[in-house]
From Swiss-Prot:
Residues 31-81 form the BPTI/Kunitz inhibitor domain. Disulfide bonds join 31-81, 56-77. The keyword Signal applies. It comes from Daboia russelii (Russel's viper). GO terms for molecular function: serine-type endopeptidase inhibitor activity. It is found in: Secreted. This is Kunitz-type serine protease inhibitor 2. Serine protease inhibitor.
Amino acid sequence: MSSGGLLLLLGLLTLWAEPTPISGQDRPKFCFLRPDFGRYGHPRPRFYYNPATNQCQGFLAQRSRENTNNFDTRDKCRQTCGRK
């Protein structure tokens, strides 16, 4: 395969790997809550949806009254609030 064909294939795979974000109207309301960092316990890595950047971002949460914009993995965050 020529280098041009490989570049085209790579470009198509890149487009396929980054789906279009869903609209804000399709997201649950809790996706727009600010992250709750907590106050007690050992910090652990978590992810929350940031509507300002339209991305799921990592943070360290401690156990307390965490809100529902708080996910174990980036994939769970994206499936619920971000990219479909």
